[in-house]
UniProtKB/Swiss-Prot annotation:
UniProt pathway: Antibiotic biosynthesis; calcium-dependent antibiotic biosynthesis
Enzyme class, UniProt record, top EC level: transferase
Organism: Streptomyces coelicolor (strain ATCC BAA-471 / A3(2) / M145)
Role noted for this protein: Phosphotransferase that is responsible for the production of the 3-phosphohydroxyasparaginyl residues found at position 9 in the non-ribosomally synthesized calcium-dependent antibiotic (CDA) derivatives CDA1b and CDA2a/b. It is not known whether the phosphorylation reaction takes place before, during or after peptide assembly.
InterPro entries: AGP_Transferase (IPR051678), Aminoglycoside_PTrfase (IPR002575), Kinase-like_dom_sf (IPR011009)
Disruption of the gene: reported phenotype: Cells produce only the non-phosphorylated variants CDA3b and CDA4b, while S.coelicolor strain A3(2) / 2377 produces D-3-phosphohydroxyasparagine-containing peptide CDA2b as the major product, along with a minor amount of D-3-hydroxyasparagine variants CDA4b and CDA3b.
Identification of the protein by name: 3-hydroxyasparagine phosphotransferase
């Protein structure tokens, strides 16, 4: 999770020179400008390529795996055009962990992980439509990208998070949910959605994978708790799916894992806003646990 202190923008510094040089090696025509984003994991530099606005994303050495997944995703997009608008790729290099792409005109839907400003119905509807289109996309090459849910749940269980009853319920719910089979963005915060030319465009594909159905919906549900009507609208999307194997069961597995990660991250923060948010996350955790039991009871 990023905080404001993690991200710095402005003119490139001397420390950025080596990473910018990698971008220019990969895309010699790229003319770098100001730093758009800087953190311990990556550097994103705005600039131009042949008169077109562009972005160069360069991962720091310890975080190159994330860049590889995003490059692999663009390879999928080239092989099988995605059902949602995405920025064009101009150049990339796996060894250098560099990706140069189109810089979109427009603005992100919300800069904060947990939006505190209203999200319009049109924007939320556009994001949900993109999620729906994406889940029906079936690029064959993504078959090896299935997430190991059993392994993740066992890792959480090893931390002493689940009591015996909760653990048994989750294993049963996972069994009933079937195998991961839905291509998902994987990090669908509203800062990763740009409103550009009347469309909602998804950016930053470093966490894309084959998930259980409803991963992106579960993340939106968790993050948009303060946006009036958002959770109810998302739950309509879940309920409209064909059956429990595509609907509520996998949604709750995804939500449990996301809430665990988010609650753990919030333990590091001591500001009043984060403490208040942690209370809300704890309430969402208990609600989700109750709904897991409820879902299994109705499943028979």
């Amino acid at each position: 999770m990023k905080t404001e202190s993690d991200v710095q923008t402005g003119a490139p510094t001397a420390a950025d020179g080596a990473l910018i040089a990698l971008a220019r090696e990969v895309c010699p025509g790229f003319a770098p400008g100001e730093v758009v984003y800087r953190s311990r994991t990556s550097l994103v530099v705005g600039g131009e390529l042949d008169g077109v606005e562009a972005l160069a994303k360069v991962r720091t050495p310890d975080w190159r795996r994330q860049c590889l997944r995003e490059i692999d995703t663009y390879d999928l997009f080239d092989a099988v055009p995605p059902p949602v608008p995405v920025p064009r790729r101009f150049a990339s290099d796996r060894e250098r962990a560099v990706l140069v792409m189109e810089r979109l005109t427009g603005e992100v839907l919300a800069p904060d992980r947990f939006p505190v400003t209203p999200v319009s119905r049109e924007d939320l509807a556009g994001v949900l439509e993109a999620v729906e289109r994406l889940r029906h996309w079936r690029p064959a090459a993504a078959g090896a990208w299935a997430v190991d849910y059993r392994g993740m749940l066992e890792g959480v269980h090893a931390q002493g998070v689940f009591d015996d009853g909760h653990w048994a319920d989750l294993l049963r719910l996972l069994e009933l949910s079937g195998a991961p089979r839905e291509f998902g963005h994987g990090d669908l915060v509203l800062a990763n959605v740009v409103r550009s030319r009347g469309r909602q465009v998804l950016i930053d594909w470093a966490s894309s994978a084959l998930y259980l159905p409803g991963l992106d919906l579960a993340q939106l549900w968790m993050l948009l708790g303060d946006v009036p009507g958002a959770r109810a609208r998302i739950e309509v999307e879940v309920a409209d799916r064909a059956d429990d194997r595509d609907g509520m069961m996998p949604f709750l597995v995804n939500l449990t894992l996301l809430l665990y990660r988010e609650r753990r991250a919030h333990r590091r923060f001591t500001d009043d806003a984060s403490r208040a948010r942690a209370v809300g996350l704890d309430a969402a955790w208990e609600l989700t646990r109750h709904r897991v039991r409820q879902c299994l009871a109705t499943a028979g």
